[in-house]
């Protein structure tokens, strides 16, 4: 008989994180309006190889679909959940291709269930509306089990970004240096260091505050699927796993024709941003 992928439906508190191999789950978050659930896809991979180093690998969490109209992260994370082979890996990888499943289904930035932007809902609230409960799940059950957090974004229908990995200014020099090293592994043309004052409640804000090696990024725009952006996100995550000895193979350079390393762009202060002075067509 052909191999079949079995997906288990469970509550957040029932999610088993330590099962060897690759397991697919749909994590159920109850709806506020009726007896029903929003099912968040979660893949947990515990590698079957022994770690190549004395210390254990840090564990990596990868998120797509934090905003539902940003598709590159959803595609890359889903492909990784299918393609990563635990026989070639050690350590733990957690993949969530559609963190805000309801906004992904609606192809919009905010959840139609509660009107909340998932990337403004952290640290979450276990008794809040569904977006806040999902954020609380990430903070209390996902973050404690990993040391590296990757949140893959794109411009949706409102922003035109060059393909870039990104992170916030970090006060701790050791954490900042390691984040910069990991950001380069996506081999994007640019790495953006952007102001943490632009918004609050971000997934990456919470991960950074907890000392995680935290990477964001913008891998497309215009509510399409940018093939090059998907490639950088997909191969970038694999490069991160190779960097920490969690996946066999050598780090891959995604643009061999480019002789230089990714260019760092700093926009760390509010004065680096120019808001539109009035509504209109620009």
Task: Name each model-derived stretch.
Residues 1-282:
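Structured catalytic-domain cores with a bias toward divalent-metal coordination
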